């Protein structure tokens, strides 16, 4: 018969508790996992299952759970999980920004959906591109790659005896700027064409003021914008795959080795 004293029981619970905090923090901000369609009980259950599979292979944590250093260690696990999840979320933030820019140029900024996650209105173009990116994300099994990265982080960023490097935020800021730049390059052709149409409409208004620019310009921008989106989608799929590959490479080779 197995017997446990109180110290052994607290040690067992704490060794399971530390990885669960990091995984649960990651699920709270990571793409797909942070969706409200996945309720809190499912997130806690999934993070508990992953932690239960991982913690026997991790070094023993000597920090006392109910102590000052234990509280600091909890904060560090939360911060590491949020940083990893936020890095993965950069792709969808870029897609949302690209969709907002396209919708604004097409004159569809008024056509919005209420986003339950951000609690703000999202343009219909942004929502469409976000769903497309989500399909690509799931098709390439990127959610499984993200889970493996979180598990690898326990070895490159150990729970005990590791202090989070401040340089991680500067490296993340530099990488996020490159991601957003790629997103702008994706929508740049549509922006140039629609801005050219607006410029031509302004010239027509100067040459013949009796022409109703609003009755011509709005449907023209809408038709050309939808036509450009039609040609953009085949180009967007390999573009998204490249960004996702760069994202996984950055998290594996840069973020986990700081």
From Swiss-Prot:
The keyword Membrane applies. Its main location: membrane. The chain crosses the membrane at residues 10-32, 44-66, 71-93, 128-150, 154-172, 179-201, 211-233. It is found in: Cell membrane; Bacterial flagellum basal body. Disulfide bonds: none annotated. The keyword Cell membrane applies. Belongs to the FliR/MopE/SpaR family. Role in flagellar biosynthesis. This is Flagellar biosynthetic protein FliR.
């Amino acid at each position: 018969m197995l017997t446990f004293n109180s110290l052994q029981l607290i040690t067992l619970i704490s060794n399971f508790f530390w990885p669960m905090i990091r995984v649960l923090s990651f699920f709270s901000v990571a793409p797909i996992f942070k969706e409200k369609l996945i309720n809190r009980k499912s997130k806690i259950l999934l993070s508990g299952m992953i932690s239960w599979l991982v913690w026997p292979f991790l070094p023993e944590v000597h920090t006392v759970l109910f102590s000052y250093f234990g509280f600091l260690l909890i904060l560090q696990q939360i911060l590491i999980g949020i940083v990893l999840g936020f890095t993965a979320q950069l792709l969808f933030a870029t897609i949302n920004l690209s969709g907002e820019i396209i919708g604004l140029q097409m004159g569809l900024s008024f056509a919005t959906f209420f986003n339950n996650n951000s609690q703000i209105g999202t343009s219909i173009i942004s929502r469409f591109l976000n769903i497309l990116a989500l399909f690509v994300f799931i098709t390439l099994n990127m959610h499984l790659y993200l889970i493996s990265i979180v598990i690898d982080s326990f070895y490159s960023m150990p729970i005990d005896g590791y202090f989070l490097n401040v340089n991680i935020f500067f490296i993340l800021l530099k990488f996020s700027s490159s991601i957003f730049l790629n997103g702008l390059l994706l929508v740049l052709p549509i922006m140039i064409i629609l801005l050219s149409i607006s410029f031509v409409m302004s010239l027509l208004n100067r040459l013949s003021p009796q022409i109703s620019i609003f009755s011509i310009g709005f449907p023209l921008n809408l038709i050309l914008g939808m036509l450009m989106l039609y040609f953009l989608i085949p180009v967007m799929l390999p573009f998204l795959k490249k960004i996702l590959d760069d994202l996984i490479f950055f998290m594996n080779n840069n973020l986990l080795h700081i």
